[in-house]
């Protein structure tokens, strides 16, 4: 009985070669390249950004010391060779380590404000920040009639302290108790509280 010939093995698409300095020029070029690398590597997103485009833009902006909100303003600006090396290094680290981008740059943004994070805390991704603005601002539909009348707030499991800091802005006269079991996490929270000079309130 004749043997069946084996079907040829399917070839996997070749991995994309890493870009070199000088091949990419504008911020948009680097974002497009990063998105391709992230999708190829099947990275997960949910730690501060929800998709590869947002993650790529975040890393590019951080490498250039730009607030993410200003990306469109500089999208077509060209980068220097030194800046290109920094951006490419971050992109490759994100792919190689698979660590959340926030840990690579030690920063996360909530409600437009920057906060320090590292691996001692979970990357903040709570919707409470949005709720503070939409349901506790004192406007029509607010759950609290007068935010200025709130005297104390408890932030349980504060982690990086970012929600405690955001809460202090929503309730300007309140003392915030930021409670956390992890001593390491409290050190991160204390750093963020100090960055916003809120030691007397939190």
Please report, for each region that a protein language model flagged, where it lies by residue.
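N-terminal auxiliary segments of SAM/dcSAM-dependent transferases
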Residues: 2, 6-110
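Conserved SAM-binding strand-loop segment of SAM-dependent methyltransferases
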Residues: 197-202
